[in-house]
Amino acid sequence: MNYRVVNPVKVESGPSTGVANGQPPRPMDGLADGGPPPFLTKTYDMVDDPTTDAVVSWSATNNSFVVWDPHLFGNVLLPRYFKHNNFSSFVRQLNTYGFRKVDPDKWEFANEGFLRGQKHLLKSIKRRKPPNSSPSQQSLGSFLEVGHFGYEGEIDQLKRDKHLLMAEVVKLRQEQQNTKSDLQAMEQKLQGTEQKQQHMMAFLSRVMHNPEFIRQLFSQSEMRKELEEFVSKKRRRRIDQGPELDSMGTGSSPEQVSQVMFEPHDPVDSLFNGVPSDLESSSVEANGGKAQQDVASSSSEHGKIKPSNGELNEDFWEDLLHEGGLDEDTRNPAIDDMNLLSQKMGYLNSSSTKSPQ
């Protein structure tokens, strides 16, 4: 029986394989290189699609992409490419592949291997292996990853603003306390001024009801000027010296000169400033020796009353108002009011100006 070979096997001559040489087989070049992950490929196609530029597109530098409308991105594009609509999950996936957020105020992400027109570089992007951790830690880590994309910067900015506001509040409180203390001091001064004004008006009201006293007070001005001119020409003599003869040939003792020595002041100023005046001098001229004796007796009785450095305190005004310094119901209103007012204000200076014996 003859057998013919229908399909002969062609034996090719060539280099011996590794099996013949006893070496293990190796894969062909390029078979081991896998493509980029589907997540990166879909993301690249979604960003590179010009029809979705209103929602997501490349940045001006072409090395990052920007999600312009996160709401439409999650509701329209994510279900079309990834079968879900969770934008936070998409951000976490980007974080696992090493994407970083460029601008904290925008949803802009970048990676060294994610460039426009260079899709072959996606193979260089590797997924980071998550560390072994419990599920609770993994969920917490996902929130922290999302926080890296802008929330930490916002939190730091809010903290700085809070510190600035607290410092401003403390400063305003200090200014408020200072202003409050100043207002209290001003109120106290105002109350004191009002009290002095009330005392002054009450005193003036009583004085104006006694016209005789006012007339006598102003009638002394001419007499005062003459006495001041006379006293200015005189010189004080010591006690041990003898009496000096004046131009009329009469002698005058130091006691007589001391009775007319006084401080030159206006009658009205003396009334309100408490400066001792010479009402007793006018009384001597008007009433003679009897008035001089009355002045001497009244000065001896009230010798302890002294003016308080030319100032009228509140006690003086109260004593004057309560004790009736100017009483129109007395027997002789003009003389009595003038004497009592002189005693209160320390106008009688005959006893204080006498030379020591």
Curated annotation (Swiss-Prot):
Its post-translational modification remark reads: Exhibits temperature-dependent phosphorylation.
Q: What PROSITE patterns does the record point to?
A: HSF_DOMAIN
Predominant localisation class: cytoplasm
> In which residues does the motif Nuclear export signal occur?
341-348
Q: Provide the alphabetized UniProt keywords.
A: Activator, Coiled coil, Cytoplasm, DNA-binding, Nucleus, Phosphoprotein, Stress response, Transcription, Transcription regulation
* A cellular component annotation (GO) from this entry: nucleus
Q: Where is this region: Hydrophobic repeat HR-A/B?
A: 158-208
Give positions of region: Disordered.
231-357
Report the locations given in the UniProt record.
Cytoplasm; Nucleus
Pfam families, per the entry: HSF_DNA-bind (PF00447)
Entry annotated with the keyword Aminoacyl-tRNA synthetase: no
What conditions trigger expression of this protein?
A: By heat stress.
Q: Where is this motif: AHA?
A: 314-323
Sequence ranges of Polar residues compositional bias: 249-259, 348-357
Superkingdom in the source lineage: Eukaryota
Q: Which GO terms describe its molecular function?
A: DNA-binding transcription factor activity; sequence-specific DNA binding
Q: Which InterPro entries match?
A: HSF_DNA-bd, WH-like_DNA-bd_sf, WH_DNA-bd_sf
- Gene3D superfamilies, sorted: Winged helix-like DNA-binding domain superfamily/Winged helix DNA-binding domain
Its subunit composition reads: Homotrimer.
Functionally, this protein is described as follows:
Transcriptional activator expressed upon environmental stress that specifically binds DNA of heat shock promoter elements (HSE). Involved in heat stress response.
Q: Of which family is this protein a member?
A: Belongs to the HSF family. Class A subfamily.
Name of the protein in question: Heat stress transcription factor A-2e
